[in-house]
C-alpha cells in the first residue's frame, strides 16, 4: 500500500502549482509559466490516479465495516463487493505507482554508445567486439537502427574503441543500464596452456543531444584534420579526411575517421561532441544533487564493475541484482537477449524512486 502522506504531498504540490499559475507576477514570466504548465499537466494526471486509488480504499474501509456490523444478506452482499474491489485494487495501485515516478525526458532520446577495451590487451579488444555485436543484435531485436560513428580496430580483431549511435523508441532509457565496467573470464584462443584470463571493457551510454539541448559556440571549437589510420597505425587514406574537434570550455575532444568524406566525419564528430558536452553538464548537476543527498542519507554507490561474463561456467552475473535475477545463461546474453536484466534493473530503479518520493 502507498503511504497516504506521500499522496498528500503530491496533492499539496498540485494546489501550490495552481496557485502560482494564478499569480499575476508569475503570469508575466513566460519561461516560469511554461515550466509550471508542464508540471501542472503531469501532476493533474497523477492527482486523478490518486483520486481513483483513494476512492477504492475508502470503499474498501466501508465494506469491511459493513461486514463487521451487518449479517445475513447485507453481509454476503458486502463480501461479494469487497471481493470484486480487491481484484481491481492492485492494477489501480500499480498504475498510480508508475505515474508517481517522474518521467525523465532524457529516456526518450536516442543514444550514443561508446565501448572501450580496458585491461587485458588483445583479449579486451576482442571482448569489446563481442559487446558491440551484443548491442547491435539487441538493437535489431528492439526494432531500432544503429549507425557506426567511429572505430579503432584491435590488432587481433575486435576494437580498442568503437562509438555508435542507436535510434528508436526509449533507446537511452533502456541502454543506460549498460553503462559501466564489463568483465570477461575466458581462455583466449591464443592461450595454449588453457589458462583463464580476466579482461574488461567499459561501456558509456549518453543521451544523444539535439542542437537545442546544448549551446555550443563555434568560436570555442578547435578543428583539426589528419589522415585516417588503420590497426597498427598505418595510414589508410591519402587525404586529410579524419577530423578532431576540441571544445575549449569543457575540454571535451572527439575524433572521427570512419567515413572517407571529411564533411561526414566532421558531422559525426559534432554529434558525439554535443552529446558528451551535454552529458558533462548533466553529470555536474547530478553530482551536486547527489552530494546534497549523500550528506543527508550516506552513500549507496555500487561498484563500477556491473557484470561478469564467465565463459568456462557458461554464466553471466550482473552484480547489481540479487537472488534469481543475478545469474543468467551466457549464450542468450551474448546474442543480445538482455531484456531480463534490463527489466529487473528498471523495476529496482522504479522501486527506489518510489521509496525516495
Swiss-Prot record:
UniProt keywords, alphabetically: Cytoplasm, Methylation, Protein biosynthesis
Cell location: Cytoplasm
Keyword Membrane: no
SUPFAM superfamilies: Release factor
Transmembrane intervals: none
Family under the similarity heading: Belongs to the prokaryotic/mitochondrial release factor family.
Protein name per the record: Peptide chain release factor 1
Record organism: Salinibacter ruber (strain DSM 13855 / M31)
Gene: prfA
